[in-house]
Amino acid sequence: MLDCLSIIERYYTPGNDDYRVLVHHSRQVADLAVALSQRLIGQGVPMDIEFVEEAAMLHDIGMCRTDAPGICCHGTEPYILHGVLGRQMLDSLGLYRHGRVCERHTGTGITAAEIIAQHLPIAPPRDLLPESLEEKVICYADKFFSKSRLNEGPKTMERARKSLAKFGGDTLQRFDEMVALFGTPDSI
C-alpha cells in the first residue's frame, strides 16, 4: 500500500488549511469508494480495493496549484485544471494509474466536446471520462462530499444531483449510470 500522506506531504504542509481540507475530503471519498467497491466484490465483481483507497486519497492532489481560496488554495491556475495538474504531479512520481483518476474525476468526467463548448482551459481538448470501475467509483464517491463544507457529512442523492445539474444533461446521464452501477451511498 502506498504511503499516500507522504506523497501528499511532498506538496502540502501538514497543519496548513489546504492540507486539512485535502486530507479530510479525500478520506471521506476513500471511505465511501471502498465501501461501494466492497459491495461490488460481494456481488462477484472484481475490484482493486487497495488501488481505490490510494487513488481516492490522491484524487484532488492538484488543487494546491489552483486559485481556489474558498478551499484554502492559493495557486495560480483555474480550479477546473486541478485534475489535469494532479495527473502531472502523480505521473512525475511514476503513479500513472493514480494520475488517470485525478484527470478523470472532475464532475462525472468531461468530454472533448464539453471542453470546447464551455471554453474550458484544458488543452488539447480530449475526453477525460472515467473508464475503469475503479476510476468510476472514485468519481462517483467524490460527488457526495464538499471540500468547502467538510463537517456536513455526505450530500443526499438529491443534493449531489442538484450540484451536477448546472453542467447539463450529459453530466446527469453519466451520474445516473454511476448510480445504476454502484447504488446509493445511503444503502451501505
Question: What residue spans do the PLM features occupy?
Answer:
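Alpha-helical scaffold segments in carbohydrate-active enzymes
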Residues: 32-35, 143, 177, 181
